[in-house]
């Protein structure tokens, strides 16, 4: 059971979150069963909106005036449950997973037409797999099915009051997939290969109200399918040192929320296409009792990347379009060192280029820093846990035209937790200090926002008391 409540750093940014999580596991002779249940309730989370840099310099804690006028906020209620069942057979181990979630969402956006949103989402699915291994070969085959149904309505937002309905549509996303994985293992090397095939069916039943005349019915349906192969090689240099190389191809369909954000009005945005990516990574890793680290170089080539943008008169609402081709080329370093009694140090560093080309125009992808660094110290003594982290994020561009640059920042947080048990009830009491050095930075950049309202200033130094219980 948990509850989070805050007045927010900025005006019009308070929120309340409540959640209940239940987990139960049972073991039988050849069967393992796990059941999870999560209920989440956020009655309100106000949105202060994005600011121009001039407004940030004037008062970084202020909210955008239109967000206050239209009472921009959202409320969410979500129920999520799942059942995992694993058992052994003569031909291998069967793993199954069945899940369901329901989400009720109400959102108020800072404009009139369509600015009051009601969404009810049902999401369900199942996955089944069979795996086995011999002395030198491992394999897995499986299938998955998913179904998402969104009942989406939009109304006029009359300065925080619900107005007339302007959109009413039922959206559906169905997916059926099959996959196979194999690994051929020898003492010095391992060859891994995989193949997945997915079929997607996306549809929309749109009831668009024709004011003063009648009701108009619009139907949209589209099928998509694709193969996603992968291939990898791991070569052992010694007992704890490995070289590895991987190739993979994947594609991603637009989500229902992205498709329904149609700049031409109701219905789906038929100009929005799936994005596809192919990539390589080459790396080295070493593991020992006290030190482990990995160094990876990567290259990803993406076609029809889906990016967000805003339109005049609909500021605060995300629209989406495909952005030609993009390339990601870089390197990542991760390391973990066991200090013994003083704890554990974890560190990571990324340096990369994220570039795009669209209709003869090229530049850096908006909203992605070229480099970042993080350092974390974990210390534990009896029931006391201490976590100190430091993160550096390089500068980035806020727009695809690369005209507005957001400065870099250095952020540090500290968390102290103590666990107390009382009559079978476990209490985790914590003190968190966020932004320890009082850094002025932005916790979100609204890439390609209209009117240069890119900036959502983050809180300065903040003290948080938390109490968590489980039983």
What feature does the model see in each segment?
Residues 30-33, 91-94, 136-139, 188-191, ...:
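Repeated loop/turn-to-beta-strand initiation elements of outer-membrane beta-barrel proteins
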Residues 298-303, 340-341, 345, 395-397, ...:
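C-terminal beta-signal and adjacent terminal beta-strands/loops
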Residues 58-84, 167-175, 218-228, 232, ...:
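Outer-membrane beta-barrel signature, preferentially recognizing the C-terminal barrel domain
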């Amino acid at each position: 059971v948990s509850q989070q409540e805050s007045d927010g750093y900025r005006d019009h940014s308070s929120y309340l979150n409540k959640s209940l999580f239940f987990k139960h596991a049972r073991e039988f002779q050849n069967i393992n069963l796990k059941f999870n249940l999560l209920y989440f309730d956020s009655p309100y989370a106000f949105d202060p909106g994005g600011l121009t840099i001039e407004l940030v310099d004037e008062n970084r804690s202020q909210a955008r005036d239109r967000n206050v006028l239209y009472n921009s906020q959202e409320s969410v209620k979500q129920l999520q449950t799942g059942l995992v069942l694993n058992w052994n057979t003569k031909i291998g181990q069967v793993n199954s997973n069945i899940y369901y979630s329901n989400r009720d969402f109400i959102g108020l956006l800072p404009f009139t037409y369509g600015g009051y949103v009601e969404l009810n989402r049902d999401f369900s699915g199942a996955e089944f797999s069979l795996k086995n291994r011999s002395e030198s070969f491992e394999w897995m085959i499986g299938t998955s099915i998913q179904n998402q149904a969104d009942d989406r309505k939009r109304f006029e937002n009359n300065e925080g009051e619900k107005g007339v309905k302007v959109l009413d549509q039922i959206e559906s996303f169905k997916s059926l997939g099959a996959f196979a994985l194999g690994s051929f293992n020898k003492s010095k090397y391992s060859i891994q290969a995989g193949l997945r095939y997915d079929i997607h069916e996306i549809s929309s039943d749109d009831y668009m109200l024709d004011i003063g005349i009648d009701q108009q019915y619009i139907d949209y349906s589209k099928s998509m399918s694709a193969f996603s192969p992968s291939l990898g090689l791991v070569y052992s240099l010694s007992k704890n040192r490995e070289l590895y190389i991987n190739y993979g191809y994947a594609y991603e369909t637009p989500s229902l929320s992205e498709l329904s954000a149609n700049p031409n009005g109701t219905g789906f945005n038929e100009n929005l296409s799936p994005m596809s990516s192919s990539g390589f990574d080459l790396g080295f890793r070493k593991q020992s009792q006290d030190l482990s680290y990995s160094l990876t170089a990567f290259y990803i080539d993406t076609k029809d990347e889906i990016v967000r943008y805003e339109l005049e008169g609909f500021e605060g609402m995300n629209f989406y379009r495909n952005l030609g081709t993009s390339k990601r080329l870089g390197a990542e370093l991760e390391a973990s060192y066991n200090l013994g009694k003083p704890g554990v140090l974890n560190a990571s560093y990324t340096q990369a280029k994220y570039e795009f080309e669209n209709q003869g125009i090229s530049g850096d992808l908006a909203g992605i820093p070229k480099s970042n660094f993080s350092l974390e110290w974990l210390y534990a003594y009896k029931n006391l846990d201490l976590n100190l982290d430091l993160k550096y994020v390089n500068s980035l561009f806020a727009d695809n035209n690369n005209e507005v640059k957001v400065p870099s920042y250095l952020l540090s947080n500290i968390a102290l937790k103590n666990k107390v048990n009382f009559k079978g009830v476990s209490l985790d009491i914590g003190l968190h200090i966020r932004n320890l050095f009082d850094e002025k930075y932005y916790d979100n950049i609204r890439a390609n926002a209209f009117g240069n309202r890119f900036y959502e200033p983050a809180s300065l130094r903040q003290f948080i008391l938390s109490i968590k219980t489980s039983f």
